Amino acid sequence: MNANRATTIVFRTACLAGILSLAFLAKGQARAEAQRADKGKARHVVTSRDGTRIAYDKQGNGPAVIVVNGALSSRSDSAQLARLLAPHFTVYSYDRRGRGDSTDTAPYSARREIEDMEALIDKAGGSACVYGKSSGASLALEAASALGDKVRKLAIYEAPYSEAEGAAAQWRDFRAKLDGLLAANRRADAITLFMTFVGAPDEVVAKMKASPAWAGMEAMAPTLAYDNAVVGDDRSVPVATATQVKAVTLVMDGSASAGPMPFMRPTADKLAKVIPGAQRRVVEGQAHDVSPEVLAPILLKFFN
């Protein structure tokens, strides 16, 4: 490996370490604040087709917007975004199956998660705008493809597909190892594997384990396999799915992700190319953990 290449790898790892450290160490505090803010608020539940109970929060007035979170996230992680959108929309933030207050039903399939979203959309009146981040963007894309006019508009941020050299083989190896750890109920090790896969150094993982967020992450660890299933067997952009999307779509990535996560830009570019009529936007100054204060005005303009 030449010196320039080594320097680039170190730089990208350092950048990603900072991003992950700030994002995940702040997660515990954000959840605690959200729980305090929501104390006494009635929790809503909708029943999916297979009997799974999906917990959700509902706030605001206006057209329905459903927020779909990514890996190791619950509805509390989107609480700030929901509050910012609530003056203009009725915002539904939900716990994906197996997370938070939602139940789970075996066997898992991505189709079941689409049915969960459909139940929520039906509860919201039969159609909704949908925003998804990371693996939640992948799920939102699948739902928009499958549910047709029920998804009025679709906004996705950094769906984690990658067609970089060697990405498919690395993905299959990661999935096999993760499935083995989860089968052995080694949840902490499964989370550690996941964080290592996305580039977090050992010291960042150690800080996360000591953070208030860790216990909740362990509880959600089995759903990492669900995220993997949604992203797909080889992590490639799902062209056949994307071409079936009827909703007006906004595809986003953050300008600050280009260094630590260089696959995000070509992935977003390709998605915008294959989704019919899709709009494309690079969110300046933002990385994978996009700021709700930056994102909310973009979604407000697009969904209106």
Spans of features found by a protein language model:
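Alpha/beta-hydrolase fold catalytic core
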Residues: 2-65, 88, 304
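Conserved HGGG/HGGXW glycine-rich cap/lid loop of the alpha/beta-hydrolase fold
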Residues: 48-103
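Active-site loop/oxyanion-hole signature of alpha/beta-hydrolase fold enzymes
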Residues: 92-131
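Conserved hydrolase catalytic core segment
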Residues: 127-165
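Short beta-strand/loop motif that positions the catalytic acidic residue
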Residues: 245, 251-253
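Conserved alpha/beta-hydrolase "acid-adjacent" motif
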Residues: 258-267
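Catalytic active-site module of serine/aspartate enzymes centered on a nucleophile-bearing elbow/loop
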Residues: 276-304
